[in-house]
Amino acid sequence: MTKKKAHKPGSATIALNKRARHEYFIEEEFEAGLALQGWEVKSLRAGKANIGDSYVILKDGEAWLFGANFTPMAVASTHVVCDPTRTRKLLLNQRELDSLYGRINREGYTVVALSLYWKNAWCKVKIGVAKGKKQHDKRSDLKEREWQLDKARIMKNAGR
């Protein structure tokens, strides 16, 4: 009998969209599957993905991921034309799609990709319903983060 591979903690994450949390208030998160081609899976296994500028469009009752860039590997396939920025279908159930439609129709809301990761053998994308931040919101978040770091540093030094 074969042994299971040892799971490396933290190795399931393929790509993060850190800018999304900086530029948007994330109100609700959903987990969606991705309809991928073979060369895309190979690229994801190699960690060659970028979702920094990606967002989700809902049309004709389906969700589509725009702007995600999966860099094709040179040895992936010679007979298939690889389009790194093609739109990819998101696999969501109808209840989740209806919830997204209801939230997006409100003024100022959008859906952005937050992270791309492996769940068992399946590639999943975490998407979030987001509302854009104003400049002063970004500044206050930065101040809060700096204060938390300073506070932790003070507490660490106070114990000495």
UniProtKB/Swiss-Prot annotation:
One term of GO molecular function: RNA binding
Keywords recorded for this protein, A-Z: Cytoplasm, RNA-binding
UniProt-listed Gene3D superfamilies: 2.40.280.10
Pfam families: SmpB
A GO CC annotation given for this chain: cytosol
BP GO annotations: trans-translation
Localization in the cell: Cytoplasm
InterPro entries tied to this protein: SmpB (IPR023620), SsrA-bd_prot (IPR000037), SsrA-bd_prot_CS (IPR020081)
The protein's role, per its UniProt record: Required for rescue of stalled ribosomes mediated by trans-translation. Binds to transfer-messenger RNA (tmRNA), required for stable association of tmRNA with ribosomes. tmRNA and SmpB together mimic tRNA shape, replacing the anticodon stem-loop with SmpB. tmRNA is encoded by the ssrA gene; the 2 termini fold to resemble tRNA(Ala) and it encodes a 'tag peptide', a short internal open reading frame. During trans-translation Ala-aminoacylated tmRNA acts like a tRNA, entering the A-site of stalled ribosomes, displacing the stalled mRNA.
Protein name: SsrA-binding protein
